[in-house]
């Protein structure tokens, strides 16, 4: 896995707290708004982004009304994500502004609009994985990492 930038400290439910687990953060739930741990738990994460747990810290768990009672301290990063792009943009090592391609095939939605990336994100192309077809056209499937502003 390609990792750029520093790990982010956050809290996740005990059942999810395993290295390698990926999740999408959708924003704080109602109980988070008044929780004393919200700053470290949800305050470090960006809604709509994908995160991957690198390490579970060996600290005691904390109580939480959402995660079946307990959360653990973990280190997370934004992982690389696969996305289909226009072939002319597919140059390994280049940084592009992400522009999603329309694809009418619902089974390929995750390749053309993957969760964790937004239209207009700056991304670095890590690897070119191959071709993917949709609507009679061929696109390049690439692995990208988001570049933070």
Swiss-Prot record:
It comes from the Archaea. Pfam families: UPF0179. Belongs to the UPF0179 family. PANTHER family: UPF0179 PROTEIN MJ1627. This is UPF0179 protein TON_1048. It comes from Thermococcus onnurineus (strain NA1).
